[in-house]
């Protein structure tokens, strides 16, 4: 029996690790332990409940600052990892929880499995601190599960052996398929649908948020028949200017942040998405919804190459121009709508489990390794 520790801390990690957790739980050779670090304590219980997950271990968050959290998390993870023999530690993405989980595993000689490996902008300030964290995780990872060929190529360029990289697709698509099947997510809106807007990234705080809000206000006034749905981040740095500039517009609805299932339903009913979220760049194409990225660069260029997304930055004029182009050009809108999802087909979790089984010496390892070499 192989003991596998899954480390999660934030909403996106839970979403993307949930389908892998359920797939691992079905394996007779795996003992799976879900550990939650408490990084996003308020959101965790609800989102885990949405995926029928009850954590086996929950760390006690110490202090409010990132430094306090990191120190407390590291010490508690050390106790967990030294308490028994682990076959591998699974982390996802580029959060502080993922980094601390990977670092604790590395120090204790436990192989790290990194889900969503190889995303890069090579700009340590954008996104901050995620770009630095994922690069550091990449240096100490044994099993790199890259969502796309581009992510694999980034790892190869950094000197990672191709024998340690598997292109699996992104588990976020698996999670969406699970939600559609088990929670009844489907398009319910009639007509065009709404414009869905989200913003939360640290690099967009301040003037960038204000510019985006001015663009939304201009679009809402130009198109009074278009409903704008904006679940607003709780951080006052974001919440303040959003409410100041948009609260009085009759066709703009400002809400509290959505839970996962609410966001999936909002995506299914959307005409277009404006966001700085990485996760939504991966999710919107599943529902055939064009997306405009409110950033200057993205670590998910596959969406741009496929044609289902475009980068507009945070310039008021650029945002308004891009939205109006899609409003006035049905052919361009349909092209983006029909581009498909370049991030996977919903089988990523099954592929990851097969490859882990091969590397850990259980299951049909030779067949899996042969298939992995073909993919790589």
Regions found by a protein language model. Give the residues of each.
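Nucleotide-activated sugar donor-binding and catalytic core shared by glycosyltransferases
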Residues: 1-230, 236-376
